[in-house]
Amino acid sequence: MGEIEQKPTPASRLGAPENSGISTLERGQKPPPTPSGKLMTVKIQMLDDTQEAFEVPQRAPGKVLFDAVCNHLNLVEGDYFGLEFPDHRKIVVWLDLLKPIVKQIRRPKHVLVKFVVKFFPPDHTQLQEELTRYLFALQVKQDLAQGRLTCNDTSAALLISHIVQSEIGDFDEALDREHLAKNKYVPQQDALEDKIVEFHHSHIGQTPAESDFQLLEVARRLEMYGIRLHPAKDREGTKINLAVANTGILVFQGFTKINAFNWAKVRKLSFKRKRFLIKLRPDVNSSYQDTLEFLMAGRDFCKSFWKICVEHHAFFRLFEEPKPKPKPVLFSRGSSFRFSGRTQKQVLDYVKEGGHKKVQFERKHSKIHSTRSLVSQPTAPNSEVPKQSPQSASLTFGEGTESPSAQSCQQAKETKVCTLEPGPRQSPALSKSPSGSKAADGTAAAAPPEEEDEEEGGKDGIRPSNPQPPQPSTGSLTGSPHLSELSINSQGGAAPANVTLSPNLSPDNKQASPLISPLLNDQACPRTDDEEEGRRKRFPTDKAYYIAKEVSTTERTYLKDLEVIASWFQSTVSKEDSMPEALKSLIFPNFEPLHKFHTNFLKEIEQRLALWEGRSNAHIRGDYQRIGDVMLKNIQGMKHLAAHLWKHSEALEALETSIKGSRRLEHFCRDFELQKVCYLPLNTFLLRPLHRLMHYKQVLERLCKHHPPNHADFRDCRAALAEITEMVAQLHGTMIKMENFQKLHELKKDLIGIDNLVIPGREFIRLGSLSKLSGKGLQQRMFFLFNDVLLYTSRGLTASNQFKVHGQLPLYGMTIEESEEEWGVPHCLTLRGQRQSIIVAASSRSEMEKWLEDIQMAIDLAEKSNGPTPELLASSPPDNKSPDEATAADQESEDDLSASRTSLERQAPHRGNTMVHVCWHRSTSVSMVDFSIAVENQLSGNLLRKFKNSNGWQKLWVVFTNFCLFFYKSHQDSHPLASLPLLGYSLTIPSESENIHKDYVFKLHFKSHVYYFRAESEYTFERWMEVIRSATSSASRAHSLSHKESHLY
């Protein structure tokens, strides 16, 4: 590898350290042995116009040279790029990665190879690395200067203003005009100078990374973005230009697009001499197959364009790289060319799963000056804060979010110990990245076209392959807004913008465990094996003791939840005049008596357990090995508080009504939800007293089942069970109604584009991630099923971190059917509404069956009710368009997916770990039945967590609720240190090969993330397995309903 001429490479200017780089080979594959022999020097021109010389063996395949360039740049997402050069016929072609370099570049001393962008994704948020987006921005800058990216003056000025912001920083008119005089970005730049300066003034505070992102946001909407024109003629001899994009083949007349052939419509591509042929699929109502013919300058031009089409189709439409064709025994017909490298789907999965060593870097622009504070503003487009200071050091925790109070963390080469020093609480702000969706936009949707060289008679057919199972990754997803696998986000919501996700603590570097925090790491905590074994032997062995202990541990958590409203929320409200007095008098006077009562209840339970364990009054211990009398006494006391319990539903409705009518109160409540103590949505805490009654009922059922009828505690337990069952039955209807009401309001906060989600009569049924088939292929969408309508949304990179509603399908008159064979997509469903039809695909067969069952049930209910009521119809977005107009509008909205807000449209942070986001990142779904079952399956207590790199165990206080594990140092902590959403995880018992050698250990596993936890007894082990299994393995609807019916509220 040679030396750079004068200027450093993009990676070195960004401060990226040298490393071995990332190969484009899939995991488990080994690169072909590099041929020995004579070396050849190849000059590569980078996107910043610097040149680099590389020495490679002459007989080496093109992949060796391409990988050397990617390694030199430390480029992870190198598959979007390619090397182009003029061949001996002066035709600009792409370097074939499989052929020997010497057969392609015959005179390397006289050929300049260019490293450029080859595949332009439809959505720049799919580019997950800042370096990748920077290189794309350089490509846009280059295309502007060369006249490839044509646009109007306003768009050109806006693009240049973002480039100037990235290069020189915040607005300074004199500096701007001096810079524009020295740098020409477009041929007629002088006429645009005033507009450029005006636009640049609006970008104050925008970081270079944000400028790159906004540049791509503007560029991707231009018709000529990523378009490379190839001159041709149609059958009539009219001069046209052909181009290929992620969607298919495009036809231009000049710079105006006049036709487009989507991949789904193309059956076969071929060429014969200088004729390029496109064979289309027949229409639904016709068996006639249309074949289009275009004439190009010659066979070489024709074949070159055909190869480009083959590669674009494979990259954007296939799940995995097509397998090579077997060599013919006798005769060889047709082209042997095939796409080589990872598909976009594989690239997205590879980066998301953390299958690489994240390179931490900072931009080094000598003239950068920005007035924006990283603390005060959300950094919407950044996948990571470019510059990390000691005050914003970060800790990765699984796939990693961060500790807001991190003050210092040494690099692992120095020490593994990370420390936290107390500091002022930072203003919560989101640090998000424009990451791509789980399913690639453009993965295999319909049966793809065959590509063949008819002149030589061969076929290079490309068929969609089944996606490979996810490979285990060893790194953490740093710099991503994705849900942390075990996140140190003690707020349970948005993470501070001034905290970066450091890759230097990832397991790849053997530096720290994915389960690490200053309070949860190997060095900071003593080993607890001997101590815990001793304590466990002193505990009683009776199952009734552990049932009673469960009452104590869960009561502690319940008391903390009451304090969120009675103490923390009330204290915050008293400091600000943002809540009406009537609302205050409805909420707080009904929580304070409950808090006082349950404080005394907990003391009684703990005193009884102390006697049971023999820690005091050992001579009378036998008389106190029971809990039924305590439960009966206090449940009878609760009946006197029933009036307060009835008020909680009224308080919830009043709060949501007030929030709807007061922007100030809405912002106040949203800010409170971002505080550390509010680890769940605020309205969830208002329903906690109703949920707690069910837990008492379950505990008493277990006690009655455990004790024989002649046991001293049986009579009290049975009497207490009768009392609590009566209370639960009285509140049953209210609880069902309020859970639906609370869920609708929670979903409303996650959605934008619909204002009337919560109306009387609307019921939530299921939410989850599905892939929607469109002209761009399969694109990940979040679907929300209600009893009257099915909404689908996309997750754009917005400062609010919400999902944008893009379409709605009324259920009345809808039909649903499986359509895997028709579209060639696994787990595919076709939904046909009265005005619109869509095709969706689930991530698995079980997910498809859940959606099929729930949607069909909702359709049947809509049919029985003879269509939606007028009120339900009025709640839906207006839809008076004709079917054609509706389709066009839907297509338009598809082009607008994932669009980010500009820096002038920043919104307040939004909780980023809601169930909607978990389902999005785990590609799963959850129903209202699941939510109701989750309410019943809540548990608290001490667990031992195994250290990743040693045999030690660490004691943690763990709370399981809302499909998530929350971790505390002890039960006295006011807020969790970390959280682990469990949807998508598998729950198993460790095998002998894992060398755990301890009793009562269970294992949680998701992709490369593995955690071992240890319970104190057989009963607690079974209880943890039971409640966690309810979240990790969602049962079928029929099973869920039967379970639900067997547990009456």
Curated annotation (Swiss-Prot):
The keyword Cytoplasm applies. One of its GO terms (cellular component) is glutamatergic synapse. GO terms for biological process: dendrite morphogenesis; enzyme-linked receptor protein signaling pathway; positive regulation of skeletal muscle acetylcholine-gated channel clustering; postsynaptic actin cytoskeleton organization; Rac protein signal transduction; regulation of presynapse assembly; retrograde trans-synaptic signaling by trans-synaptic protein complex; synapse assembly. Residues 1-37, 361-537, 866-908 are annotated as: Disordered. Detected in forbrain (at protein level). It is a peripheral membrane protein. Residues 40-320 form the FERM domain. The modification Phosphothreonine is found at residues 24, 887. Residues 543-734 form the DH domain. Its main location: membrane. Residues 371-395, 402-412, 473-492, 499-514 have a biased composition (Polar residues). Signal peptide: none annotated. InterPro entries: Band_41_domain, DBL_dom_sf, DH_dom, Ez/rad/moesin-like, FA, FARP1/FARP2/FRMD7_FERM_C, FERM/acyl-CoA-bd_prot_sf, FERM_2. Keywords: Cell membrane, Cell projection, Cytoplasm, Developmental protein, Guanine-nucleotide releasing factor, Membrane, Phosphoprotein, Repeat, Synapse, Synaptosome. Gene3D superfamilies: 1.20.80.10, Dbl homology (DH) domain, Phosphatidylinositol 3-kinase Catalytic Subunit, Chain A, domain 1, Pleckstrin-homology domain (PH domain)/Phosphotyrosine-binding domain (PTB). It is found in: Cell membrane; Synapse; Synapse, Synaptosome; Cytoplasm, Cytosol. Residues 763-860, 936-1033 form the PH domain. The modification Phosphoserine is found at residues 20, 23, 340, 373, 389, 403, 427, 433, 437, 513, 517, 837, 876, 882, 893, 900, 903. GO terms for molecular function: cytoskeletal protein binding; guanyl-nucleotide exchange factor activity; small GTPase binding. Residues 435-448 have a biased composition (Low complexity). Intramolecular interaction between the DH domain and the PH domains can stabilize the protein in an autoinhibited conformation. May play a role in semaphorin signaling. Functions as a guanine nucleotide exchange factor for RAC1. Plays a role in the assembly and disassembly of dendritic filopodia, the formation of dendritic spines, regulation of dendrite length and ultimately the formation of synapses. Interacts with CADM1. Interacts with RAC1. This is FERM, ARHGEF and pleckstrin domain-containing protein 1.
